[in-house]
Amino acid sequence: MVFALFFVTGALFGQGFKFGVKFDPVITWLRSDVSDVLPEQARLGFDLGLTADFYLARNYAFATGMTLYNTGGTLKYTSGITNFRAKNGNVPIEPHGKVTYNVQYVKIPVAMKLKTHLIGRFVYSANLGFDPMIRVSAKGNFNNETNMSVSDEINFLNMGWHIGIGTEYSLGGEVAFFCGLSVMNTFVDMTKPMHDRITSNNLFFRIGVIF
């Protein structure tokens, strides 16, 4: 259905619309605003899905799409948690216990994209925008449990902002390979407990094809 929507939109906009697919490896670092919740190691995830550029002028586009964004990380709770909410009920996390989160969101970026003219077979671009996200899955490893549902600990909505650069290499006609780097920082608390605020820094290695 999503593919059909993009193709219909492309037919309506003609040369003013570009459709793409991408698979971005992502490195995530969690951040905490309290001293008793400590982020541990970074986590490798991915951002997979569709891109759509609606051109307002030759070198300016409204950039959006829909992707499945896999993220997470490990938090160390130095004071412990008395009522960590998991699928099997409220469980305690001992002092200095760790929880590794594996969270998936549907992400719908909203951005402005600026592009150069064609230079040889290359086009260079920069983009800046926001990233609304809807949680679709949240699992965690804790207390010797693995892949346990922890949806009750993770907020349903999240939001970030991003800035990125990239390049497109023409493969002939309307088809181009693209790659680039993008940084996204979230500013909405990922977890539900009110005593802390967990956000993330993310580095995206952008890879895809534009049609």
What are these regions (language model features)?
Residues 1-10:
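Bacterial N-terminal signal peptides
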Residues 13-53, 210:
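Short glycine/proline- and aromatic-enriched beta-strand/turn motifs that initiate or cap beta-hairpins
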Residues 15, 40-46, 102-108, 122, ...:
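Residues that define the transmembrane beta-barrel architecture of outer-membrane proteins
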Residues 17, 23-27, 53-141, 210-211:
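Gram-negative (and chloroplast) outer-membrane scaffold detector with strong preference
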Residues 31-37, 74-81, 138-146, 190-196:
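Outer-membrane beta-barrel translocator domains and adjoining extracellular loop/strand segments
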Residues 37-39, 97-101, 150-155, 192-196:
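Outer-membrane beta-barrel domain signature
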Residues 48-50, 108-112, 126, 163-165, ...:
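Membrane-embedded beta-strands of outer-membrane beta-barrel proteins
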Residues 71-77, 152, 158-211:
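Predominantly the C-terminal beta-signal and adjacent terminal strand-loop region
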